Amino acid sequence: MAVNYEAVIGLEAHVQVRTKSKMFCKCPNTHGAEPNTVLCPICMGYPGVLPTPNREAINKTVAAGLMCSCEIALKSKFDRKSYFYPDLVKNYQITQYDQPLCKNGKIHIHGTGFSGEPLPDKYIGMTRIHLEEDPGKSNHFGNCTGMDYNRSGIPLMEIVSEPDMRSADEAYAYLVALRQTMQYAGISDCDMEKGQMRFDVNISMRLRGETKLGTKVEIKNLNDS
């Protein structure tokens, strides 16, 4: 007899915030410029620079939280996340760890999924929305890789869902609803061809009816342009 398993899916959506300038400097928030031409000492992390938070990015992240029924923090802070990767020119990222701007939200899904099958009318929980800076971008040319740091420092929301989805259809419906919400509120263009909305997917399997989570597999950087 076949064992009845179910998928448990959670999503991390990375959404660029539509602002005039980058997160911590006055460089313009643009797309499509020649590589490594939209840079300054702050977004390159030169010694002695003093980053200043972008008020517009903070306000729009709070608006995103309100649109998703989140609790808005009365006190929040930024942290340095240190790691070494070619697209992270500073070798650290300014992000939020234990005090995000928004937490405990939800997104409503209903209707049909991409397969055409009807979806359950349900809410997908949202763990948190925190604000950070986007890293640079790797461009691959045959056997060579070039680094474009123009994207470095663009304000980026990381929107983390609860593991409440049970199918690819539900995950698709959640992302469609999230994208429509961000576009409607003017928070982001969510142009996936420009990398303005990207996803990491966390998937595990368990016997249907169980509550314990299984071993998680993470699929990173879906729809990264």
Q: What do the PLM-derived regions correspond to, one by one?
A:
Residues 1-225:
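Basic, nucleic-acid-interacting segments
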